Amino acid sequence: MSKKNVNKETITEVALEILHEKGISHLTMRNVAAKLKVKAPALYWYIKNKHELLQLLADYICSLISIPKRKDDWVEEIFELSNNIRSVLLSIPDAAEILMDTLPVTRERLLLIEKTLEIFHRANFPEDKIFFTVTYINTYVTSYVLDEQKQQKLLDEMGTEAIRQKFITSVSDISKDDAPYIHHHFKNPDSGLKNKEDFMLGLRIIIVGIQREIGE
């Protein structure tokens, strides 16, 4: 790839390659420039620093999220949108961390927020509850995926069986008399692994709380 090919699109493409190959710890201006076969200063025409690089990636990530078709039930729309967000974040290493480390000030990200706000306006939510509700759901989805991605890194680094045995050994070292609930809930080491079912359960609990708050 020659210098004349350097633009925001190719910078994004190369940054994504680095994320998939080595993760966010290796995502630097120097490494992006090296993959583009240019010197780091050549990137400054498009992005000034790593923060702007992350902003670029965050906007790209948000552009991949499908907005659900309008439904009569706002809950169904939020379930579908939340699942769409989770799926996209899980498809890109460290995507949740990137969203958490950047400001929601880019076009695609603001449009995603706009569409989410629209769902609650159409549902005639109390005006003073809309922004809080959107923020709270966004925090839950992003935090859940961040936990999933950190968990997956541990599984990749240590191995599922090694982690399972560590849990079994650690729990066995504590008597049932001292920690009966630990023994009860940690009988199956796999029970703590994040999955879609647990994600949806948490989201449902949040939705029920929101419905109660607005008296629905």
Q: PLM features: what roles do these ranges have?
A:
Residues 46-47, 133:
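Residues in the recognition helix of alpha-helical DNA-binding motifs
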Residues 11-19, 57, 61, 85, ...:
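Short hydrophobic clusters on alpha-helical segments that form packing/core surfaces
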Residues 30, 39-42:
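Key DNA-contact positions within bacterial/archaeal DNA-binding proteins
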Residues 1-22, 26-31, 35, 47-55:
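Basic, helix-initiating cap at the start of DNA-binding domains
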Residues 122, 150-216:
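C-terminal peripheral helix-coil segments that are non-catalytic and often amphipathic
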Residues 67-111, 115, 127-130, 134-137:
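Hydrophobic alpha-helical connector segments
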